[in-house]
Amino acid sequence: KKGNGNYAYLDDIMEAEKVLVQELTQTFYAVADDVVMNLEFNPLLVKQYRLIGFDNRRDAVTDPSSYIEGGEIGSGSSTLAIFEIITSMPQASDSQNIALIKLRYSLCNNPNVEYLNFPVINNFEPFNRLHNELKLATSIAMFGMQLRNSKYLGTTTWQMIYDIALQSANTSNFLQNEYLSLISKADELYNGPKKRPGKRKKKN
């Protein structure tokens, strides 16, 4: 199907290790085909929502009659969807489900369609108490939105994005260190090199 499969650009030894060693099973071994995930929010708890990072398929998301073709999933792969929501009430019980995840897929070489449902509990946590993985994912989402000059970022700055990434990144992880470098390069490209304080020359 259109869009299935994987590709990679190997420009250094670290990228080759990532693709050919760390992610080998994800790249070469598919465990499911035509995978689609739908998320249904509980209208009693969620007043408005916005899916972040799906701008190229915005029409398909807003049109309930449209069909989004699923894709294949490799062994050990994972995916993360980030939503911005406005709640319908100030506080909700932790026992209430805020949404329902509906997963549709087919096993490889099997035409039968399988369905799985997963309730999403209301387990809100302040940002400073989130796991570092989620903080880093937030920084990456903000980074992409900043590149597109998104109106939803408000007063977010490159420095704020960098600070979140620096506090949550694993410094022994090459890819996460490379991400920190990308933020600095993007900041310089968008805003120009930062001026360093120096001594002023005395006028004669």
Name every feature range the model reports, one short phrase each.
Residues I86-R196, K202-K203:
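Conserved functional hotspot residues or short segments at active or partner-binding sites
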Residues K1-C108:
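Acidic, polar loop-rich interaction surfaces within structured domains
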